[in-house]
Amino acid sequence: MMRFRTEIDIPKADFEIGAAERMLFVGSCFADNLGRRFVENRFRATVNPFGVMYNPASILHTVEKCSDVRPRVAVFTLGTNHVYILKETGEIVDNCQKRPQRLFEERELSVDECASYLQKAINLLKSQTAASGSSEGTLKVIITVSPIRYAKYGYHGSQLSKATLLLAADKLVKENPGVVSYFPAYEIMNDELRDYRFYKEDMLHPSEQAVEYIWERFRATYFGKAAEQFLEDWRPIREALGHKPFHPESEEHQTFIARTEEKKRQFEEKYHLL
């Protein structure tokens, strides 16, 4: 049989994301895209609590401020190795807040610098998990590189930035066996889904269909039977909650609402979400 596309071979992860897993997503807007699906499906997921963070230093800044979030699984989505340094203080800022560009110096982090910032974030999450005495298991970290290209760097510059992040991710996987794994969202988008029909109108961001496909590959890599059953149990409740009635005040619809709320309560009780 002839094949008309390359398919990324992704081995099954050596750990599983569980039902109603406690998770933290930090990184580029692709972290929002992926994390939103976990939130919509009732996982205990925190997604970019201090806004989108594009570079490894800013990801560390978020983790430092998230002492009350103790995830069992953390997902870091790396967008760029470019950082902006406030000249007055020498600090890397997470957001320039529309201040004049002359106040900042733009710099590219090296592979080792990217890996160092992320390693500090991993170590901090591990220590927070240990201090909490959590019985949910040891911390697992999933690193992925955002497939979204940065046109403002030029396409060659964008590729150099992504290459730096890919090397940093590989370094972290090798130095943290059993803790850090790499999910190839970047490769899926640029190999399996390389056709422009999988992009939005700006020709840079993945379309909703592309994000959905990457979500399905993510599930196939990290979900076990418990997480899939969790999704299956929640799906009809979610669909019922999103139902738009023609006659919202009717007795029939009020009965439907009451029945749906009872199913939701039973679901939350079953998975200890109350």
Regions found by a protein language model. Give the residues of each.
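Extracellular glycan-modifying ectodomains
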Residues: 1-274
